[in-house]
Amino acid sequence: ISGKELQEMSTEGSKYVNKEIKNALKEVLQIKLVMEQGREQSSVMNVMPFPLLEPLNFHDVFQPFY
């Protein structure tokens, strides 16, 4: 392998590594955003003045109409 080929391989390898590092950082930022959104939702739930009700059952709601 010539010196020129080694230099080209090194350059391409550096480009690949840089691209993968950028992708990894983007994923970390996305995970951070999701975690922050979850934390915000959790804090909103903690300050609600009433507990959330259980989901309504269709039959319980419409039973009088049967």
Swiss-Prot record:
Q: Which Pfam families match?
A: Clusterin
Is the keyword Methyltransferase assigned to this protein?
no
GO-annotated molecular function: unfolded protein binding
Q: Which domain of life is it from?
A: Eukaryota
Q: Does the keyword Disulfide bond apply?
A: yes
Q: How does it sit in the membrane?
A: Peripheral membrane protein
Name the InterPro entries on file: Clusterin-like (IPR000753)
Q: Name one GO cellular component term.
A: mitochondrial inner membrane
Compartments annotated for it: namely: Secreted; Nucleus; Cytoplasm; Mitochondrion membrane
Q: Which UniProt keywords apply?
A: Chaperone, Cytoplasm, Cytoplasmic vesicle, Disulfide bond, Endoplasmic reticulum, Glycoprotein, Membrane, Microsome, Mitochondrion, Nucleus, Secreted, Ubl conjugation
Reported modifications of this chain: Proteolytically cleaved on its way through the secretory system, probably within the Golgi lumen. Proteolytic cleavage is not necessary for its chaperone activity. All non-secreted forms are not proteolytically cleaved. Chaperone activity of uncleaved forms is dependent on a non-reducing environment. Polyubiquitinated, leading to proteasomal degradation. Under cellular stress, the intracellular level of cleaved form is reduced due to proteasomal degradation.
Protein role: Functions as extracellular chaperone that prevents aggregation of non native proteins. Prevents stress-induced aggregation of blood plasma proteins. Inhibits formation of amyloid fibrils by APP, APOC2, B2M, CALCA, CSN3, SNCA and aggregation-prone LYZ variants (in vitro). Does not require ATP. Maintains partially unfolded proteins in a state appropriate for subsequent refolding by other chaperones, such as HSPA8/HSC70. Does not refold proteins by itself.
Q: How does it assemble?
A: Antiparallel disulfide-linked heterodimer of an alpha chain and a beta chain. Self-associates and forms higher oligomers. Interacts with a broad range of misfolded proteins, including APP, APOC2 and LYZ. Slightly acidic pH promotes interaction with misfolded proteins. Forms high-molecular weight oligomers upon interaction with misfolded proteins. Interacts with APOA1, LRP2, CLUAP1 and PON1. Interacts with the complement membrane attack complex. Interacts (via alpha chain) with XRCC6.
Family in the record: Belongs to the clusterin family.
Name this polypeptide is given? Clusterin
